[in-house]
Each structure stands twice: as structure tokens, then as C-alpha cells.
Regions:
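Flexible "arm" and connector segments at domain edges
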Residues: 1-211
């Protein structure tokens, strides 16, 4: 029966005032159930650098799977939606692991939440006619640029401090373009809220059920 549990097994919760902040809050609450270490402790360590890169990889992999499903068969849009929301969960988790809260993102972008939401919509409008391949390339490119600012890598013998301002600023820019890729398809703000809410409930259920 557990294998049958998915986003269609739940209903979305009521609409919050600030959808993006609510997504961050819900992800942080979920993470408390399985993270044994305090997240965002020190991104200068090799361990946390590796975790951040790992979640970037998960984010892009799920996005690629969603886009691939769309390219193969548009009738599989429900499958694509679930993969995209999985990607969003990994993405927000990566930001929180990096100690980059929504408030910090707004600070690095030098604006407020309402303006950011409008910026995302404006960017989405500019790329709405792009191919699936181009959208994925956009998301992947900015992920790699941001994570390349993490100085600690296994192949390096010397561990160096990360330029946090550069890493956070470029990750904040990735945040804008990543969500713009979602909005450029059919996942507008309301749809994103609905699907994230359902998937978040799925994940809580799976953790509670030891799935």
C-alpha cells in the first residue's frame, strides 16, 4: 500500500500569504525528522561542501527526469509534475544545508519577497518559448557556477575557506532562474504551492511509516 502513496493521495493545504517562505518553512520542519547534524553549521568543511554538491546533483537529476518525460510524451505531465516537485524539495534542502534561508536570499538579491516573485514571473515570461533542453541547460549552468565557489574538494589536499558572499550571491541568482524554469511551463505560483504541499505531506507520511 505504501508504494501507492503519492501526491494524489493528499489534498493541498490553504493558501499562505507568502508561498515561497512557507515552502522554506515546511522543508525546514521536514528536515528536522531525519537530519541528525545541525544543518548549515559550516560550509567551509569538506563534509558540508560535499552535501551541498550532492543535493545540487539530486535537484538537477529530478529536473532532467521531469523534462525527459515531457519530451517523450506530454500525456505524462502528472509524472513530470511529481519529478519537478521532488527536484524542488532537493533544491530547498540544498539551500538550507548551505544556511541560505529565504530571508538571506532576499538580502543577497537586495529586494523584498513581492519583488522577487515578480522577478521570477518576468524571467519565466522571457524563456517560456525555450526548448526543454535549453531550460535544463539554464538550470544546470547556474548550479555549477554557484557550487564551483565551494573551495573544498576531495582532490585538494589543502582545505580553503569559501568566499561566502560569492557563493550565496550566485546561488541566489540560481534560485531566480530555477523557479523561472518552473513558471515558464505550467507550474505557476498557485500550482507550485498545491503540489509542494501534497508532496510534503507524502514525505511526512513516508518518514512516519519508515518507508
Amino acid at each position: 500500500m505504501l508504494d501507492m502513496v503519492n501526491i494524489n493521495s493528499f489534498t493541498s493545504e490553504e493558501t499562505p500569504t507568502d508561498i515561497i517562505q512557507t515552502i522554506f518553512d515546511k522543508q525546514a520542519e521536514l528536515m528536522k525528522k531525519y537530519w541528525t547534524k545541525p544543518v548549515g553549521e559550516d560550509i567551509d568543511t569538506l563534509f558540508w561542501s560535499q552535501e551541498i554538491r550532492k543535493f545540487s546533483k539530486y535537484t538537477v537529476e529530478e529536473l532532467a527526469e521531469a523534462y525527459q518525460a515531457m519530451e517523450m510524451d506530454w500525456s505524462r505531465w502528472e509524472h513530470s509534475e511529481e519529478e519537478m516537485i521532488d527536484s524542488l524539495h532537493f533544491f530547498i534542502e540544498k539551500l538550507l544545508i548551505a544556511n541560505l534561508t529565504y530571508k538571506k536570499i532576499l538580502g543577497y538579491l537586495g529586494t523584498d519577497s513581492e519583488h522577487v516573485r515578480n522577478l521570477i514571473k518576468e524571467k519565466a515570461e522571457k524563456i517560456k518559448d525555450w526548448s526543454i533542453e535549453s531550460l535544463l541547460r539554464l538550470a544546470t549552468y547556474h548550479s555549477n557556477i554557484a557550487d564551483n565557489r565551494l573551495r573544498n574538494k576531495e582532490r585538494k589536499s589543502e582545505q580553503l575557506p569559501t568566499n561566502r558572499d560569492l557563493f550565496y550571491k550566485e546561488t541566489a541568482e540560481w534560485f531566480l532562474k530555477y523557479l523561472a524554469c518552473f513558471y515558464s511551463l505550467w507550474l505557476n505560483e498557485d500550482k507550485l504551492r498545491e503540489l509542494y504541499s501534497k508532496k510534503n505531506q507524502v514525505n511526512h507520511f513516508r518518514i512516519k511509516s519508515n518507508y
